[in-house]
């Protein structure tokens, strides 16, 4: 086995997906605690104390207690290199999340055990399922009264179409929470106990002899009944199914009280796959331990360090090894680029990196070379990774600078924030109007906040409301086709499109110009 293969096998790169407020950021912090990266895990809601979640680093995230960008965190655990991508839970930022899911080898799905599967979780699950990567489930908030565990397992199959296999099982919940029956490790994990007293072994018959009082407790007896039922009618653990994404191991716990998280992390590290091969150049398979370096840009973030007004391109290494100063080719332009400055992350904290391998995420200082979706490669053979998903905006606003004397900072801020991909920029076809398009309202609020905070440029947003965006072949375009009901604009690449007032206006246009081809995006 080569040194490269050995290093690649140590990598575990995954994203955490959930509905907002299911506890995704809290479980991330607890994992970082076990990785020795942080000394204490604060709760995200404690905003007044000035103590914020490690992964919520942007000013607006700290202010509102929500994640609106994907954070990257890296640490060592049990001889493995863990790369966590903490994605935005808010639906308006799902495009950032979708792209992030293209850069991971597994996903952790966090579910609020009181609420079960919620809409955003369902949406994100579909993307992960499509990729065919393993999904690990953490049923969170066991310290509160929630739904019956059997119902939660059944819901996975009913709503998501995936088999759930229980790795542990609650002994009570809420104020009556006693612990977890650890099926996988044949032990009981007691709630709110020190490390030395936390685990009680079960004998070969599954009997608990070290705590007679608990063994006789009606809650424990109820747990044993559930486990008997699972053995009779539940799904059987199947590692091959897990790796294909057809079965999800289910763990119960409470991220807030750090209960069940360590057991989950231990199992995850052992079960989750190392970096897998990628399909490149449309139909070729590229092994992760192929010696030639290659990767793709899945995210661009401006102002991670507000003092330097910089831009970082996040690259998932798909194959080979990165070395500081490596010369690569940017596939889109064919131009050579030397990668001298690369960083690894602990949210907004950075460490200069001299080498990294397939599975790792590195940040490249970007002076404008990179775009989201770019492929880079070091060998002579061109390598192009598949396109990343792109959403068609649904809400549009005209944007102007409040202070006309600050045009320079207005343009710089707008161009940098647009390059991050959460919001899209259009220009009037025959005017100088700037029009922004987004999937949801929160993106405009974040844009406005960041323009003021990071670029000292206050903006005015004038709503155009919900519009249907449709691109048109330039050869078929006649500017006279434009009207107040179908506004003609051009995208960042200069391609023309109409912003229709509603679906009726689009149908009317198609009836009037039956030969004109409209597409939802280029």
Curated annotation (Swiss-Prot):
PROSITE patterns xref list:
G_TR_1, G_TR_2
Tell whether Transmembrane helix is among the UniProt keywords. no
Question: One GO CC annotation, please?
Answer: cytosol
Q: Where in the cell is it found?
A: Cytoplasm
CDD domains in alphabetical order: RF3, RF3_III
Q: What does this protein do?
A: Increases the formation of ribosomal termination complexes and stimulates activities of RF-1 and RF-2. It binds guanine nucleotides and has strong preference for UGA stop codons. It may interact directly with the ribosome. The stimulation of RF-1 and RF-2 is significantly reduced by GTP and GDP, but not by GMP.
Tell me what this protein is called: Peptide chain release factor 3
- The gene that this protein is the product of is prfC
């Amino acid at each position: 086995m080569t040194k490269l293969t050995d290093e690649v096998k140590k990598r575990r790169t995954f994203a955490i997906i959930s509905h907002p407020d299911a506890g995704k950021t809290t479980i991330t912090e607890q994992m970082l605690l076990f990785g020795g990266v942080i000394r204490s895990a604060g709760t995200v809601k404690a905003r007044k104390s000035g103590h914020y979640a490690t992964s919520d680093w942007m000013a607006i995230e700290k202010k509102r207690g929500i994640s609106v960008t994907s954070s990257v965190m890296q640490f060592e655990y049990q001889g493995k290199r863990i790369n966590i991508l903490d994605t935005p839970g808010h639906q308006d930022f799902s495009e950032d999340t979708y792209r992030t899911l293209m850069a991971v080898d597994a996903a952790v799905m966090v579910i609020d055990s009181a609420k079960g599967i919620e809409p955003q979780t369902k949406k994100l699950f579909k993307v992960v399922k499509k990729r065919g990567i393993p999904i690990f489930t953490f049923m969170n908030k066991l310290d509160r009264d929630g739904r019956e565990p059997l119902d939660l397992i059944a819901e996975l199959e009913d709503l998501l179409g995936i088999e759930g296999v229980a790795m542990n099982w609650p002994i009570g919940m809420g104020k009556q929470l006693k612990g977890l029956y650890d099926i996988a490790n044949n032990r009981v994990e007691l709630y709110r106990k020190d490390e030395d007293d936390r685990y009680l072994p079960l004998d070969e018959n599954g009997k608990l002899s070290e705590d007679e009082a608990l063994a006789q407790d009606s809650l424990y007896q109820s747990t044993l009944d559930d486990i008997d039922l699972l053995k009779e009618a539940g799904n059987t653990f199947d590692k091959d199914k897990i790796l294909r994404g057809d079965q999800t191991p289910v763990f119960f716990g409470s991220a807030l009280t750090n209960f069940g998280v360590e057991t989950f992390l231990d199992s995850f590290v052992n079960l989750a796959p190392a970096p897998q091969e990628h399909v490149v150049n449309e139909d070729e398979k590229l092994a992760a331990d192929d010696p030639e370096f290659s990767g793709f840009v899945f995210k661009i973030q401006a102002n991670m360090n507000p003092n330097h007004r910089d831009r970082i391109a996040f690259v998932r290494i798909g194959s080979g090894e990165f070395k500081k100063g490596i010369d690569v080719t940017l596939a889109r332009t064919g131009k050579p680029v030397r990668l001298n400055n690369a960083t690894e992350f602990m949210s907004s904290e950075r460490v200069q990196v001299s080498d990294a391998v397939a599975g790792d995420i590195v940040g490249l200082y970007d002076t404008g070379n990179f775009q989201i979706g770019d492929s880079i490669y070091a060998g002579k053979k061109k390598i192009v990774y598949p396109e990343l998903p792109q959403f068609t905006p649904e809400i549009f606003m005209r944007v102007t600078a409040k202070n006309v004397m600050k045009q320079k900072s207005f343009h710089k801020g707008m161009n940098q924030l647009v390059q991050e991909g959460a919001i899209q920029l259009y220009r009037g076809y025959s005017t100088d109007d700037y029009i922004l398009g987004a999937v949801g309202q929160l993106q405009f609020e974040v844009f406005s906040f960041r323009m003021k905070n990071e670029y000292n440029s206050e903006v005015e947003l004038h709503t155009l409301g919900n519009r249907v965006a449709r691109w048109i072949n330039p050869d078929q375009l006649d500017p006279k086709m434009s009207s107040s009901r179908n506004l003609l604009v051009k995208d960042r690449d200069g391609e023309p499109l109409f912003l229709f007032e509603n679906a009726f206006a689009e149908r009317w246009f198609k009836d009037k110009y039956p030969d004109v081809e409209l597409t939802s995006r280029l």
